[in-house]
């Protein structure tokens, strides 16, 4: 997933909003790479935010803030031209939670979403339908060769 993000954003500035990043491994790979990463924002549950803070401690200059997921409000996030990055957790987030995160898209703070999630939505939120409503069909979409049923999709304006 890192390799795909790296190839896609190449020579542009990446202002990531990591939603549900968990262990912090992907964010650390991006923050320590040759990608021009600025103003990274982390939105997650408290124990994961602590882990992400520790893992990315040496990259504090590239980090804007850490936000507790349960209290999230789009007005807490400043900026434009941001990219939401999510791996594995969109389907698990309740629809109301997704709406609050996707408010960042609605108010033009986020221009792109990079998603690596499964599409089996039985018992899960239909995050993909919401993304298509905001962006239309993804500019890139393919099934993972490593994880059957998981798709990498890039939506952007």
Residue positions per predicted region:
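Conserved alpha-helix/loop element of class I SAM-dependent methyltransferases that forms part
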Residues: 1-13
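Conserved class I S-adenosyl-L-methionine
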Residues: 12-22
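Conserved SAM-binding loop of SAM-dependent methyltransferases across substrates and taxa
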Residues: 23-36
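Class I SAM-dependent methyltransferase SAM/SAH-binding core
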Residues: 37-62
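S-adenosyl-L-methionine
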Residues: 54-79
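A short, conserved alpha-helix within the catalytic core of class I
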Residues: 92-105
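Conserved beta-strand signature within the Rossmann-like core of class I S-adenosyl-L-methionine
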Residues: 109-121
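Core SAM-dependent methyltransferase catalytic element
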Residues: 140-157
């Amino acid at each position: 997933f890192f390799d795909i993000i790296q190839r896609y954003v190449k020579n542009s500035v990446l202002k990531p909003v990591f939603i549900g990043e968990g262990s912090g491994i992907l964010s650390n790979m991006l923050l320590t790479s040759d990608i021009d990463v600025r103003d990274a924002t982390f939105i997650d549950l408290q124990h994961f935010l602590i882990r992400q803070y520790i893992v990315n401690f040496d990259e504090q200059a590239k980090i804007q803030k850490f936000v507790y997921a349960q209290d999230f409000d789009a007005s807490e996030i400043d900026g434009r031209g941001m990219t939401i990055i999510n791996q594995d957790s969109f389907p698990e987030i309740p629809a109301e939670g997704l709406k609050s995160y996707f408010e960042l898209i609605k108010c033009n703070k986020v221009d792109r979403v990079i998603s690596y999630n499964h599409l089996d939505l039985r018992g899960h939120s239909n995050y993909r339908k919401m993304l298509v409503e905001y962006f239309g069909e993804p500019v890139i979409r393919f099934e993972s060769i490593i994880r059957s049923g998981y798709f990498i999709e890039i939506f952007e304006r």
